[in-house]
Amino acid sequence: MNILIFGPNGSGKGTQGALVKKKYDLAHIESGAIFRQHIGGGTELGKKAKEYIDRGDLVPDDITIPMVLETLKGAGPNGWLLDGFPRNMVQAQKLWDALQAEGLKLDYVIEILLPREVAKNRIMGRRLCKNDNNHPNNIFIDAIKPDGDVCRVCGGSLSARADDQDEGAIGKRHDIYYNTEDGTLAAAYFYKDLAAKGVTKYIELDGEGSIDSIKDTLLKQLA
């Protein structure tokens, strides 16, 4: 089973991706990790990518796409879940063409829907427990709202990450994601159009639901 997943920062995309990975024993492939793997491993593609990164430039698609494709091809027998790529319409088309050329099927495309303001509030509402950062606490999500200023799981003190409170940085990330002309949503809609032609399946999920309700809906549609 091969899957692409889309969702804005704050939508729970990483959480749902991890649940799907565990359920179907998929390789969970994150675009940033691909760069780190190639650069750290000193591959030819990694060396080329590093030159651009060191100059502060975007790595061109003719380097990025082969990196992604190589990782997908080596993902293992159960398939993969790709997170964080593509990020625009051009990349979506190039990735699709590359998958077709390699005979790799794209079974599902998942989009987690969440209003921009809700996504921003969720990011700014995240709180970290001093005892365990994996303890879920968010002042804007009722199911995991902390008890005052202490962790809802263990009672430890809470803090907020500085970048989670930077509205400007959050806005820039969301500007890219919610752009339906040449941003990440444009990439998602490219696959939505393909699904309308019957060449893949497109799943839309209401990101305002609980983690469990979203998971249950998703797994039913993947079954």
Swiss-Prot record:
One of its GO terms (cellular component) is cytoplasm. Residues 125-164 are annotated as: LID. It is an enzyme of class 2 (transferase). Its EC number is 2.7.4.3. Pathway: Purine metabolism; AMP biosynthesis via salvage pathway; AMP from ADP: step 1/1. One of its GO terms (biological process) is AMP salvage. ATP binds at G10, S11, G12, K13, G14, T15, R126, G209. It is found in: Cytoplasm. One of its GO terms (molecular function) is adenylate kinase activity. HAMAP family: Adenylate_kinase_Adk. Consists of three domains, a large central CORE domain and two small peripheral domains, NMPbind and LID, which undergo movements during catalysis. The LID domain closes over the site of phosphoryl transfer upon ATP binding. Assembling and dissambling the active center during each catalytic cycle provides an effective means to prevent ATP hydrolysis. Belongs to the adenylate kinase family. This is Adenylate kinase. The lineage of its organism: Bacteria, Pseudomonadati, Thermodesulfobacteriota, Desulfovibrionia, Desulfovibrionales.
